[in-house]
């Protein structure tokens, strides 16, 4: 559902994120590079007939090693959260990437399908394990969820971080266990 994803705006820059819930509250999970070093972010939920905007949302936690961020949502925000998956991801598994990469200068909703091409991609430069997948992602998709279907619902298996521009159909995702 479009209401479950969002676009975070920072000085005219957009990115994606997803609502998650913990024992400590409700947050937007995204990439650190989406919010940069800001202490607050404006979160917008682009719904079918309206856009909900929450300003001055506090950046609660930042992981520079994994390029992840949690932004607090106000109590007045009732957008549903998506559950984090505990399933072990395997090569060949079907996945869905979602986000708001934008089209014609405006954020636009995008859902793409693909499969896991390397469940344990290791990149020497940053000594991090990623999920490599074939679902198309574009600039602005950063911070959006990589999802698997579990029964009638979807669960988050990772946070889309970047695409390999030097190869076709290569998306790079931070696994949910890094959260």
PLM features per residue range, with description:
Residues 18, 136-160:
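Catalytic nucleophile loop of clan PA
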Residues 2-28, 53-56, 111, 143, ...:
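A conserved glycine-rich beta-strand in the N-terminal activation segment of trypsin-fold
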Residues 19-21, 59-61, 99, 118-120, ...:
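A residue-level detector for short acidic-glycine micro-motifs
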Residues 79-131, 136-142, 162-171:
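Flexible, gly/ser-rich surface segments that form the specificity/activation loops bordering the active-site cleft
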Residues 7-9, 59-61, 134-138:
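Short Gly/Pro-enriched turn/cap motifs at secondary-structure boundaries
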Residues 20-66, 73-76:
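Catalytic-histidine neighborhood of serine endopeptidases
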Residues 30-36, 99-101, 157-166, 176:
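Short beta->alpha transition motifs characteristic of CBS
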């Amino acid at each position: 559902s479009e209401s479950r994803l969002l676009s975070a705006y920072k000085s005219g820059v957009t990115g994606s994120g997803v609502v998650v819930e913990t024992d400590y509250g409700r947050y937007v999970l995204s990439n650190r590079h989406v919010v940069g070093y800001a202490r607050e972010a404006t979160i917008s939920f682009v719904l079918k007939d309206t856009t909900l905007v929450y300003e001055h949302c506090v950046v609660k936690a930042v992981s520079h090693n994994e390029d992840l961020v949690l932004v607090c949502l106000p109590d007045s925000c009732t957008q549903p959260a998506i559950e984090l998956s505990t399933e072990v991801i395997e090569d060949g598994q079907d996945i869905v990437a979602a986000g708001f990469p934008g089209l014609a200068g405006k954020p636009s909703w995008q859902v793409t399908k693909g499969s896991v091409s390397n469940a344990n991609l290791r990149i020497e430069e940053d000594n991090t394990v990623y999920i490599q997948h074939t679902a198309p992602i574009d600039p602005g998709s950063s911070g959006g969820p990589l999802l698997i279907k579990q029964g009638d619902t979807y669960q988050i298996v990772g946070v889309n971080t970047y695409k390999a521009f030097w190869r076709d159909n290569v998306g790079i995702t931070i696994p949910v266990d890094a959260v």
